[in-house]
Amino acid sequence: MKQPTLIRPRLRHRRSTPAAATKMCPKRHWLVNNRAAGSRGSGGAAARSRRSLDQIVEVLVALIVVNCLATAAAALITPPDSLESLGSLGIPSSSASSSEDDDDMSSGFYRIPHRLEGYPQLQQLQRGQNFKISPKPCSFGRVEGTCMFVWECIKSEGKHVGMCVDSFMFGSCCTHNYTDNIVLPQTAFSYTRPTKPLTLRPRPPAAPYKPMISGMTTIERPHGAGTLVIRPSGPHHQGTLARPHPPPYQSKPTTASDLHGSASHPSSSSSSSSSSNPNSIWHTSTQQQQQQQHQQNQQNHWQMTTEPSFITKPRPTGWTKPGIVNLPMPARPSKPSKPTKKPIVYDRTPPPPPSVPPSTSTSTTSTSLIWPAQTHPPQPHRPTRPQLSPGTSLAASSSSHWPSSTTSTTSSTTSTTTTTTTTRRTTTPTTTTRRTTTNKPTRPYQRPTTATSSSSTSTTSSKTPTTTRPISSSSSSSSGIVTSSQRPTQPTHRTPVLATSGIETNEISDSSIPDAGALGHVKTISAARSECGVPTLARPETRIVGGKSAAFGRWPWQVSVRRTSFFGFSSTHRCGGALINENWIATAGHCVDDLLISQIRIRVGEYDFSHVQEQLPYIERGVAKKVVHPKYSFLTYEYDLALVKLEQPLEFAPHVSPICLPETDSLLIGMNATVTGWGRLSEGGTLPSVLQEVSVPIVSNDNCKSMFMRAGRQEFIPDIFLCAGYETGGQDSCQGDSGGPLQAKSQDGRFFLAGIISWGIGCAEANLPGVCTRISKFTPWILEHVR
């Protein structure tokens, strides 16, 4: 034991290792290596070669194992079933289904504002498994087509006419060589379905023809000045009717049959008529024209559009729009209306009225036409449909009256008076010589809105005062001969209307409401210095139940609240709004609460987002100030109201005008209101480019709560909320409509802002009505800021 310990130190100090020798003597390093190689011999070389071979084999085995593991891991991460179900998302099917269910539950459980960007994007990504372009209509020039993929167009032997866009996908506007899709450019009316003249029909049809067009939307776009192109209607829209303008009246009838066949139905026009009553509102002038044949009036008839035909209606040169004269009157009608639905006419003949001494006579005349009549005995005649003042639901009655005499002989002059007044109850004197019967109207140009009352005559020669019933919300009409020697007196009794031709419409009139006093007369107030609530371009008639594209200029107070994008160079639609004066607009609080003033843009006079060349251009303004209601809650959407002030005041135009505000706090239960906006056509559906409108009834808050309860929801509906919708669903606002107006028509013919669209659960679902902010509760607050 001691010997090794004694020898090792000596060996360590006397002998140096090769490494030490190398450090000490670098020049003799090769000698040390030779000595080490000689000492180890051939056995060391064989060991080194074996170790190198083992290392090479280990590296190769490791590479093979890593490759196998990577392949197995890739197969586990992307199984085939997930590829089929999720496309390129790479999400397992089980997790995808569970997350989709969670998204469905979350989206249907909470209150969701009806603005864009209201839904999570993950749900849309997961539902976009198979990317498809919806077959919506597209047009290039006067060529109609369908949007689809290019390969679909080629496979269906179609013709590519242009490019179309559906969400983020670009497709081909493809047209096919079908008969319904051919539109000849040289014809003004192509492939329309004409109806027979009304003179050849025993009675008008019960309902207009409604073409069912799947996947189409009604788009009424201007196609140049003075021309209106009406496109095919959508799956929930009814057929669009285009009526020709009535020709003016002539001063003399051509034959006696014309006089007796229709009291105010002359052949052609060669006179100028205007309102002579100082209290009348509408002034209409016509140019003098040459007398034409009587049969030309019978050839103008109603025409219906079929897919995808166009109906082009040029405006006559002598036609002027009716002006508005601001006169202090108890009620006023609105603009003339454009018919969209044929009425259903039915006759009722109550018993004849009692005779009254001839000292009673009352009449208000607005238009009087006097011409000599020929010597023919009076015969049963057909009353014409008088041209109505727009907005009035009572039509003027027209009948022919001869002066009182003992025999049915000739008369020197015959006066026919067509009157439209704006009072709810007026007294109509009738000079009678023979009983006549009200038959079907013969002129298709003039259409009443709700009722046409015509006075029938008896064989007595005394004057009979009658009081017409207030059939609709605006006025009643009277006709007769006014004698200047007698002063009108008011009768103390009421007699039924002799013969009434009623027209069934889908509008809720005052007669269908249980008690007009229960609703209360809604008084309106204007926040602007000019007139409010009266559209000047479009002439609305009856409200259409079911969504459809609005006419250009029909809702001139509709605005688009937009958010700037691309560093302020462009803007995108976010919400709707309502113009209340030249400086301020009203919208929902959740539309602008999270935006800076520099991010908000207001566009007024807009109609079609996809077209710039419209009848009148839109106006876009920046925002100088925003005022969100101080009690606004983003959790419950209570007090969801905001005011936005424009940078520069607006100049009102025919397509830009303000809406009235409700002055009285009326519940408005049972009234029909109209929702307008550019929101989605269905929940999660496509966004339209043309302004849409839909009519919905206003329900009470208690009924609204019960509707939510029937749908399995318990919602708190305070009095600052206003519910509108059907129990069965089908018509409602949707994402993108938030902040837009819920407008209703008052008894004076003006539209007022009943509500601002706030929130809803889903879109157009049963027992889930849309909820708006009730503006009547905030009228003082609005006027405080805008005045």
Curated annotation (Swiss-Prot):
Topology in membrane: Single-pass type II membrane protein
Subcellular location: Membrane
Maturation and modification: May activate itself by proteolytic cleavage.
EC id: 3.4.21.-
GO biological process per UniProt: actin filament bundle assembly; cytoskeleton organization; proteolysis; wing disc development
Membrane-spanning residues: 59-80
Cysteines engaged in disulfide bonds, as pairs: 532-660, 575-591, 704-723, 734-763
Residues carrying sugar: 177, 672
SMART domains to which the protein is assigned, alphabetical: Tryp_SPc
InterPro entries named in the record: Peptidase_S1_PA, Peptidase_S1_PA_chymotrypsin, Peptidase_S1A, Trypsin_dom, TRYPSIN_SER
Pfam families associated with the record: Trypsin
Span list, region Disordered: 1-22, 225-516
Keywords attached to this entry: Disulfide bond, Glycoprotein, Hydrolase, Membrane, Protease, Serine protease, Signal-anchor, Transmembrane, Transmembrane helix, Zymogen
Main enzyme class: hydrolase
Expression induction or repression: By 20-hydroxyecdysone (20HE).
Residue ranges, compositional bias (Polar residues): 502-512
PROSITE patterns per record: TRYPSIN_DOM, TRYPSIN_SER
Stretches of the chain found on the membrane's Cytoplasmic side: 1-58
Family per record: Belongs to the peptidase S1 family.
Stated name of the protein: Serine proteinase stubble
Native species: Drosophila melanogaster
